[in-house]
Amino acid sequence: MISRYRMEHPIGSSATPALKNGLRYFRRSLQHAGVAFRVVAFCLFALFIAQANGQGPALQPPPGAKIVNLTRHRGYFNEPSVAINPRDPRQVVVAYQTGARIVYSQDAGGRWRKASGTMPGNYAVSGDVSVAYDNLGHAFLCYIAFDKLGTDEYWGHNATRNGVFVRRSLNGGQTWQRPAVPVIEHPTQPGIPFEDKPYLVADNTHGPYAGNLYVGWTHFTLSQSVILFSRSADDGTTWSKPIRISTQAGLPRDDNGAAEGFSGVVGPDGTLYVVWADGAHVVFTSSWDGGRTFAPSRGIVPIAPPYFHISDVDRTDGFPVISIDPRGGNGAGLLYLTWSDYRNGDVDVFCSTSADRGRTWTPAVRVNSDPIHDGADQFFQWLAVDPVTGAANLVFYDRRDDAENRRAVVVLARSTDHGHTFDNYLWMGEPFDSNNDFIGDYTGIAAYGGRVYGVWTEERPRSSRHQAGSPLHHTVVRLGIADFADAGSSH
């Protein structure tokens, strides 16, 4: 190990003063030391070297760590979403694109099967999937479907027919009802808008609007982007006429400046809390009447633009995600908010909390535990607060161990002290390079009773020679499981 260290980290003019002084002390200490002292001294010095070079201790896997390959082959697979049935936590459902593909488990992730009846009909493409369980244990799938996109990044320019759709499963995700129910749909005609990035929220609380379903999304036109919203009070059978909930309009381009990235959560009293990004802020609003009306939206956290360039990734964003600990906040719940931006020079993941229904928010806490300003990017975070334990869980890609800032692993971060600090765990330790492929716009995570499920996209290695008939895209969807229920309070 000493010779390996010398090869990779020579002590010379580039070494820090602390490293040089430590080496001198280490050599002097060993001259008259016994064997036991030498072993202890070497271990301590190895830790000192790692810290002196800006590296913390190696991350450990979370308790009960398990990785599952959900796609058996490579393809254009990305943007996964995961949900746990609160009526029966053994039931877990995962959706991913392209197409609205579903896999499900009836035994807490022990075995996974493909669902039937989920692929959309009558449209060429579908995606931007999300899943949720309602208070009855019914599973719901939301997605967009269209024939082709509009002008590059300007989806409302020359868009073809498109819409937002929802499907329901009455047996935990095994089979899905047809046809899909349109939340909003546009037939083919000149000048139609484009509906993008919907996200589904279910009220599975015991509040006055229990059972309600909510969908928010970005509505692109030729001149602007706004956040639209619709609700269902009859188990997803019908949906209300969409209303605009963004006070300020965004730019018409699917990029910085757009009103985009809807995320929502329901508090224990039935209040719906919603966030998105507008290019300069995390924007927040809420509804106290089951989604009929909303307060004026307002910026709550200034952020660097949510779209940013990361090497070897087709595109990257830091859209906000909101979740809630129903046991906190003086009965109203403790809200958690996460996003990522590059305020520190490289991309980091941040978290803030609110104990007063979103009126005020705590200063941003950096979630990733690598040294600040180390040049490593952490991105595509997603958040889930365990409704049973109150622990906040985040999943994200992490490049802290790659000096070139290209290869990523997957990290699970967890807070048990109301978001003040986060423990980082190495969930997937096989680094991958995205190779400029599209790995989606988001990951996913769900937690219940100490058991955590995370889903993400990975680029798989390509062969040196492209063979005819081989897939043009090389991504897979994987799932990680962690179990803190039997790990003790120290975790």
Positions of PLM-derived features:
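Bacterial Sec-dependent signal peptides at the C-terminal "C-region" and cleavage site
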Residues: F48-G56
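Extracellular, repeat-based ectodomains that mediate carbohydrate processing or recognition
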Residues: Q55-H491
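Bacterial N-terminal signal peptides
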Residues: S29, A36-F48
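N-terminal secretory signal peptides that target proteins for export/translocation
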Residues: M1-V35
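Generic alpha-helical structural signal
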Residues: S13-S14, L44, R72, S434
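N-terminal regions of proteins, emphasizing targeting and processing segments when present
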Residues: R6, A15, V39, C43-L44, ...
